[in-house]
Amino acid sequence: MAINTHYDHIGVQARKESAKLIMSKIKSIVGDRPAVVTGDFNITEDNEAYSTMVNSEFKMNDAYHMTAHHTGAPYTFHDYCRISPLKAPKIDFIFVTPNVKVLQSHIERETPTKRISDHNPHWADLEF
């Protein structure tokens, strides 16, 4: 199963509840089959909603941390290059169930002359 989401960028409670809802739905629909959840979560790794994704009873893994082969930028949001790479956050994630193997994870580096969004593309090679 593949799911894409875009969490609210203002409401802290909305993001917490979104994480709980997604985890509940995945658990009931997917069972023990592979699942991938991607999107703009508008959270960082120190956020409670992130913890819900990776520490719930039905656990998801952050693909970026599941391989030694993550390459590219350490951030995903640059606001059309208006945020310094030193301060830009990683708020886009690829979460996978434990039965999905992550072969590689990569976040493209955007430049003022090479950009398609206010976020860097983030991709992963997965094995099911």
Kindly give the residue locations of the regions a language model identified.
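Amphipathic, alpha-helical segments enriched in basic
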Residues: 1, 12, 28, 38, ...
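Metal-dependent phosphoester/phosphodiester hydrolase catalytic core
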Residues: 1-16, 20
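Active-site beta-strand/loop signature of hydrolases that rely on acidic residues for catalysis
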Residues: 2-5, 22-50, 63, 95, ...
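A short, polar/proline- and glycine-enriched secondary-structure boundary/capping micro-motif
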Residues: 13-15, 114-118
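Active site of divalent-metal-dependent phosphoester/diester hydrolases
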Residues: 32, 43-115
